[in-house]
């Protein structure tokens, strides 16, 4: 039995999609365990660039089973659009499985998300307005509608009618806007369910059977540890658990069946949306990193905030996710910067802090303690091993490993699949 979890160690957008796609080649099952279509990842397969938001990266390998686990919230309309997007490009989706326990995003979730965000004024948290948060709210409140309900005409109608009483009261009383009628949603979304039905099953059984038969299973996380609802920079977080522990809850696979956890990070830091960001750069170097690294959100198109590598953040990710391996991406983006900085600690009121404070007022006032390293000018985009890196680039990578306490198992020197290099096979480690 060999199972690997891929986790983002920063605020998302670390290049997980590329790494997952790379590792998918040697997996027999690829599963997502949390989030929804708020997470975008770009994959280059067969020389063609694809943008996915919901379907696992392994979909391009038709012999591999791809799972949307019970921990996700699924917008049926968005899922069907993504299926059509793949079908139009000649990609088969017969290998997709969707959990019958996954919760469904409905039009009132989208409307609630947009209205709530607008009402917060200067206190916006930067939601993608995809209905993710409200769907998870309903799940926790035990009024959510699951895939199994969507396929049952009577159950779906009954639950929809019940929910609309509450949702319409919210829209009318709180936001002074009209709600929805059952007729506006029911037939359309029931039909969506019928189109998805061929993919729906108990995915916990699929995954556990695969593991019990010694198949390699890859669990694909979305967002990143710093966006985790428990361990991230709350409330500037997502509504689920991207940490490795989310695998057990979000797929129905026991923790003892997880063998390796690969943390993915960039050689610098980026973030979309609001919230504290200790190493953020507002100068010309920040602009250079953003443009060279093409730091714009896959889902939103928003420019990402960028900053120096923060080892405090990645150490935090190591601890709460049990990281065993590190994939260091986008090293090439730093080429040409004369002096590089790595944050080794924070300073607050004259005191040095080695961990991420839970109090965001404190985190917002933390000043990064930097260690400086010399940069490099050489083109590294064709490098295939750590030994081939220029001395300064190699020392930078080694220092990242030392400061985070995680061994480098993979590194990338460009956006393409063939620019990702293996240092250690995570399936056999």
Curated annotation (Swiss-Prot):
SUBUNIT field: Homodimer.
Catalytic activity entry: IMP + L-aspartate + GTP = N(6)-(1,2-dicarboxyethyl)-AMP + GDP + phosphate + 2 H(+)
Subcellular localization, as worded in the UniProt entry: Cytoplasm
Keywords of this entry: Cytoplasm, GTP-binding, Ligase, Magnesium, Metal-binding, Nucleotide-binding, Purine biosynthesis
Membrane-spanning ranges: none
GO terms, biological process: 'de novo' AMP biosynthetic process; IMP metabolic process
Residues holding substrate: 298-304
GO molecular function list: adenylosuccinate synthase activity; GTP binding; magnesium ion binding
Cofactor (UniProt): Mg(2+)
Pfam families assigned: Adenylsucc_synt
Protein name as it appears in the record: Adenylosuccinate synthetase
Pathway: Purine metabolism; AMP biosynthesis via de novo pathway; AMP from IMP: step 1/2
Species in which this protein is naturally found: Bacillus cereus (strain ATCC 14579 / DSM 31 / CCUG 7414 / JCM 2152 / NBRC 15305 / NCIMB 9373 / NCTC 2599 / NRRL B-3711)
Positions that bind GTP: 12-18, 40-42, 304, 330-332, 412-414
Residues bound to Mg(2+): 13, 40
């Amino acid at each position: 039995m060999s199972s690997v979890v891929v986790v983002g160690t920063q605020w998302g957008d670390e290049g997980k999609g590329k790494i997952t796609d790379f590792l998918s080649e040697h997996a027999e099952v690829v599963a997502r365990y949390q989030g929804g279509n708020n997470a975008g990842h770009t994959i280059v397969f067969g020389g063609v660039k694809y943008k996915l938001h919901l379907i696992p990266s392994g979909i391009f390998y038709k012999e591999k089973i791809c799972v949307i686990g019970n921990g996700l919230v699924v917008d049926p309309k968005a899922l069907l659009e993504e299926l059509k997007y793949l079908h139009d490009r000649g990609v088969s989706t017969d290998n997709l499985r969707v959990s019958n326990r996954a919760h469904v995003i409905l039009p009132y979730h989208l409307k609630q998300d947009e209205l709530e965000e607008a009402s917060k004024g200067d206190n916006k948290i930067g939601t993608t307005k995809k209905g993710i948060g409200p769907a998870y709210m309903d799940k926790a409140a035990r009024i959510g509608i699951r895939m199994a309900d969507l396929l049952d005409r009577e159950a779906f109608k009954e639950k929809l009618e019940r929910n609309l009483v509450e949702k319409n009261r919210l829209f009318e009383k709180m936001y002074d806007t009209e709600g929805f009628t059952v007729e506006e949603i029911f037939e359309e979304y029931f039909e969506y369910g019928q189109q998805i039905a061929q993919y729906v099953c108990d995915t916990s059984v699929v995954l556990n059977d695969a593991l019990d038969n010694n198949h390699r299973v890859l669990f694909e996380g979305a967002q990143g540890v710093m966006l985790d609802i428990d361990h991230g920079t709350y409330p500037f977080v997502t509504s689920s658990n991207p940490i490795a522990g989310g695998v057990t809850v979000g797929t129905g696979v026991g923790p003892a069946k997880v063998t390796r956890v690969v943390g993915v990070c960039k050689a610098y830091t980026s973030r979309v949306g609001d919230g504290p960001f200790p190493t953020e750069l507002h100068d010309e170097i920040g602009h250079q990193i953003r443009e060279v690294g093409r730091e714009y959100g896959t889902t939103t198109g928003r420019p990402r905030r960028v900053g120096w590598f923060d080892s405090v953040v990645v150490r935090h990710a190591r601890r709460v996710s049990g990281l065993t391996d590190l994939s260091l991406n986008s090293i090439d983006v730093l080429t040409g910067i004369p002096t590089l900085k790595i944050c080794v600690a924070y300073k607050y009121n004259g005191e040095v802090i080695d961990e991420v404070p839970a109090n965001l007022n404190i985190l917002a006032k933390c000043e990064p303690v930097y260690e400086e390293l010399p940069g490099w000018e050489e083109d590294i985009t064709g490098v295939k091993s750590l030994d081939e890196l220029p001395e300064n680039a190699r020392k930078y990578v080694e220092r990242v490993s030392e400061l985070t306490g995680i061994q480098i198992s993979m590194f990338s020197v460009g956006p393409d699949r063939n620019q990702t290099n293996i240092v250690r096979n995570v399936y056999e480690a």
